């Protein structure tokens, strides 16, 4: 199984959705082969696939991947969306030894979204160190390793909204407010999150779209559609909007994904293609990930 999945992930002749199927399957595995394949994919010519591979390594919290992720972060020839995801992955893994490189990239990386991610990752590592074991080990209700711990429980939605939308507030505090609002998930919280699609930071806007995808709330469809349609928006934000629309999956969202699967920006068109493929598997009652019997005959598949 491992060999088949690694080969499928790295086979550039495969449709992008097939490669994503392999990627999503590999992130549930551990060991040298899955790690090597994901790290190789993090330098793929598809920036969408490359950034998703780096994201997966962060979600897996695989400390063995740190040196290669640091090399990705330092490589300015790679797309900012890939460097950003490498920085976020280092923050998710959460080891103090990554702080010095994150500080270096914060100072020298030319892309604002990468700088902001480094700032977040440094703060996340520090917060993890200073937080009680019980609090830092709290699992997200959405089973994701988030770039910031949620703001402390008990803050009213209106206060969290103000924090999230405050352009003078630190990026970490705004992210913390975002995840607290996500965990609340009520109508007022969703309204606050949708409002944040208009903030100045492309990094924060992309995380807002990601969170709306986690929530799968149809109240966000119109705002996400506007983001996807905006060709002047940062590709990483449009990409997350496309994925979020795929998770909401109403008829209008599906029609829009079909339209923008032809977008000239590959990060956007491939996101739509993957989202539509996932929906197709869901409709047919099949898992998007590859599922094998206990003893798969993977050598026979290609």
Curated annotation (Swiss-Prot):
Any one GO MF annotation of this record: metal ion binding
Ranges of the HEAT-like PBS-type repeats in the UniProt entry: 49-75, 82-108, 171-200, 204-230, 237-263
HAMAP family tied to this protein: Deoxyhypusine_hydroxylase
Name of the protein: Deoxyhypusine hydroxylase-B
Family listed: Belongs to the deoxyhypusine hydroxylase family.
Reactions accelerated catalytically: [eIF5A protein]-deoxyhypusine + AH2 + O2 = [eIF5A protein]-hypusine + A + H2O
Keyword Chaperone assigned: no
InterPro entries: ARM-like, ARM-type_fold, Deoxyhypusine_hydroxylase, PBS_lyase_HEAT
Keywords: Hypusine biosynthesis, Iron, Metal-binding, Monooxygenase, Oxidoreductase, Repeat
Entry function: Catalyzes the hydroxylation of the N(6)-(4-aminobutyl)-L-lysine intermediate to form hypusine, an essential post-translational modification only found in mature eIF-5A factor.
Needed co-factor(s): Fe(2+)
Keyword match Repeat: yes
The protein's annotated pathway: Protein modification; eIF5A hypusination
Residues involved in Fe cation 2 binding: 206-207, 239-240
GO biological process: peptidyl-lysine modification to peptidyl-hypusine
Binding-site residues, Fe cation 1: 51-52, 84-85
Entry EC no(s): 1.14.99.29
Cofactor note: Binds 2 Fe(2+) ions per subunit.
Pfam family, one: HEAT_2
């Amino acid at each position: 199984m491992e060999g088949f999945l690694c080969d499928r992930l790295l086979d550039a002749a495969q449709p992008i959705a097939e490669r994503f199927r392999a990627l999503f399957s590999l992130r549930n595995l551990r060991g040298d082969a899955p790690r090597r394949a994901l790290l190789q994919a993090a330098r793929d010519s598809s920036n969408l696939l490359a950034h998703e591979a780096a994201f997966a390594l962060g979600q897996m919290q695989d400390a063995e991947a740190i040196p290669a992720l640091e090399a990705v972060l330092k490589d300015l020839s790679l797309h900012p969306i890939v460097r950003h995801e490498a920085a976020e992955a280092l923050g998710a893994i959460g080891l103090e030894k990554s702080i010095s490189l994150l500080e270096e990239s914060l100072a020298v990386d030319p892309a604002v979204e990468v700088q902001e991610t480094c700032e977040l990752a440094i703060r996340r590592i520090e917060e993890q160190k200073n937080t009680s074991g019980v609090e830092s080990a709290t699992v997200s209700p959405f089973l994701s390793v988030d770039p910031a711990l949620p703001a402390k429980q008990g803050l009213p939605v209106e206060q969290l909204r103000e924090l999230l939308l405050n352009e003078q507030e630190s990026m970490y505090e705004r992210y913390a407010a975002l995840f607290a609002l996500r965990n609340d998930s009520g109508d007022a919280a969703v309204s606050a999150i949708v409002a944040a699609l208009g903030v100045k930071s492309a990094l924060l806007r992309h995380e807002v779209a990601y969170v709306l995808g986690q929530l799968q709330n149809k109240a966000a469809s119109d705002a996400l559609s506007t983001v996807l349609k905006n060709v002047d928006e940062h590709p990483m934000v449009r990409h997350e909007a496309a994925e979020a629309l795929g998770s909401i999956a109403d008829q209008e969202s599906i029609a829009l994904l079909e339209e923008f699967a032809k977008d000239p920006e590959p990060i956007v068109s491939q996101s739509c293609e993957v989202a539509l493929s996932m929906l197709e598997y869901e409709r047919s009652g099949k898992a998007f990930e590859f599922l094998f019997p206990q003893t798969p005959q993977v050598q026979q598949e290609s």
